[in-house]
Amino acid sequence: YNGLPHVERTLESVSGLETVVVDHGSTDGTVERVRAGFPAAKVVEQENLGLAAGWNRGIRETAAPYVLVLNSDAWVVGDAVDRLKRFADGIPRAAWVAPRLLNPDGTLQPSVRGFPTTWRIATEYLFLRKLAPRSRLLNSFYGAGFRHDEVREVEFAKAAAFLIRRQAFEEVGPFDEEFFLFSEETDWSYRARAAGWRTLFYPEAEAVHVGGASWRRESGTLFREQVRGHLRFLLKHRGVSAAEHARRVILAGLRLRSVVFRGERGAVYRDAADWVAAGPATTLLESTR
């Protein structure tokens, strides 16, 4: 959606591969630019039904045994696609292989994550993880200081760029389109693990991701979707009680953040807190965006 100015670099990085571009009603000329500059790419236009819906559509438009999924603000480095495929070929139960993510300036963009629990939500929203970034107790939500330099099975990884095995996609099922913008990868990896599949981090392949470089991309709407994704995951996989306890923890954390931070950032947290306060969790997840 509105992928300029990065989508051209995204497509150049996978030149020569079968390419599907799913557009969610862009108004910035993305579709026209892609069709003019990359005539071999298949462009699929649909209304903005969310990230999960776009991934599902793109994967279904090809019959390839592996599909590399890229955000429109991410691109692979060098022969990363070949590296990911060769690695996956050697591990038959590898459902999802994540490359190491870099910021545009070449610095590491941490991407390994842990499945949400009420406690892990508390460590995030109450800043407990800041006390001991490498602690498994206080920072498992963000990988407990994982160095991102070793091959490792992980709970899930940020989905700006990833290789997915079609066999796993067919067995586990599509991405849950109830997750509009956040936590769809979390949910899918959780279901994949339950079905005996593995999510792996492979640092020998790299991709650049622009979106993670600044919190300012988290407008009030985007931040609310992040909170909604966390609550939806907990409701789906941990139950009503866990989701409601998490909602109360999130509310306390957002109230704290709205005091600590000033200006635009503080306003984002205040608006999100007002929305969370209108709970319970089940009602929030039924509300329109």
What are these regions, as identified by a protein language model?
Residues 77-111:
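Conserved donor NDP-sugar-binding/catalytic core segment of glycosyltransferases
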Residues 4-5, 13, 23-32, 77:
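A conserved acidic beta->alpha catalytic loop
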Residues 116-154:
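Short, flexible, basic/aromatic active-site loop/helix in glycosyltransferases
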Residues 67:
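Short aromatic/hydrophobic "clamp" motif used to bind/position activated sugar donors
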Residues 221-231, 235, 240-289:
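Non-catalytic, C-terminal membrane-associated alpha-helical segments of glycosyltransferases
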Residues 147-149, 155-206:
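A short, conserved alpha-helix in the catalytic core of glycosyltransferases
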Residues 46-62:
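Glycine-rich, basic loop-to-helix element that forms the pyrophosphate-binding segment
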Residues 17-25, 44-45:
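Short beta-strand/loop segment that forms part of the nucleotide-sugar
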